[in-house]
């Protein structure tokens, strides 16, 4: 996926009220932009750090700018716009990049399912059945490791999705969780048990129930981002 129009650059001043950020562009313009990420963004919002943002020409938008990429203290790039993950996964699915899920004949997005009335990101239909696919965007990295982690904040919603997937798997339905690691320089991903032990426990229960866990990394520049490789999933002791 190419960023269109081209992204603009700036420096982060502060993120606040979760969905807002003040930045200074390279031309010296002070802007308040939208932050499309509900997480803590633990290594992606360093004051003074470089950011890239898109600008909309839609006159109805209150904030024309949207934060897209951060440079982390480790020098990595992170696509912090969580809304991009599903687009990237759909592109990769249609291009056959995600080999474990090849062969589908139809793809549907945002399908209602489960006892807790969740909406799954994708339903893929095959000649012999179907599967449900949930996608999580990962941006949490560490200075001393090439292993990313999820989540970066406590996520009851994420645990609910795992319970729903586990229920499907127990009923004989193929259920898949895919971590889209939107962070450069990463070789694997793991559950962030130190941040959300309840999520880590729910993930283990989902795996035991038969949920398939996949992880894929991206090629990311300020010009484009796309899924390009399979990553390992590491489990805490």
From Swiss-Prot:
Superkingdom per UniProt: Bacteria
Pfam family, one: SfsA
Any one GO MF annotation of this record: DNA binding
Signal sequence, renumbered to the chain: none
NCBIfam families: sfsA
Family affiliation: Belongs to the SfsA family.
HAMAP family per record: SfsA (MF_00095)
Record-given protein name: Sugar fermentation stimulation protein homolog
Gene (UniProt): sfsA
């Amino acid at each position: 996926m190419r960023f269109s129009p081209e992204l603009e650059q700036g420096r982060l001043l502060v993120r606040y009220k979760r969905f807002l950020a003040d930045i200074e562009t390279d031309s010296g313009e002070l802007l308040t932009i939208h932050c499309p990420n509900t997480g803590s963004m633990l290594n992606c919002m360093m004051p003074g750090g470089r950011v890239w943002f898109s600008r909309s020409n839609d006159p109805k938008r209150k904030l024309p700018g949207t934060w897209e990429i951060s440079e982390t203290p480790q020098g990595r790039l992170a696509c912090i716009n969580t809304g991009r993950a599903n687009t990237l996964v759909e592109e990769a699915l249609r291009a056959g990049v995600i080999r474990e899920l090849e062969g589908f004949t139809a793809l549907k997005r945002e399908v209602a399912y489960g006892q807790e009335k969740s909406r799954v990101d994708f339903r893929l239909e095959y000649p012999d059945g179907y599967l449900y696919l949930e996608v999580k965007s990962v941006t949490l990295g560490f200075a001393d490791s090439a292993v990313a982690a999820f989540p970066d904040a406590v996520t009851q919603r994420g645990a609910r999705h795992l319970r729903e997937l586990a229920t499907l798997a127990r009923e004989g339905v193929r259920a898949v969780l895919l971590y889209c690691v939107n962070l450069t320089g990463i070789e694997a991903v793991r559950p962030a048990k130190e941040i959300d032990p309840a999520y880590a426990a729910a993930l283990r229960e989902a795996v035991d129930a038969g949920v398939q866990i996949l992880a894929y990394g991206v090629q990311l520049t300020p010009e484009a981002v796309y899924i390009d490789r399979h990553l390992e999933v590491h489990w805490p002791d």
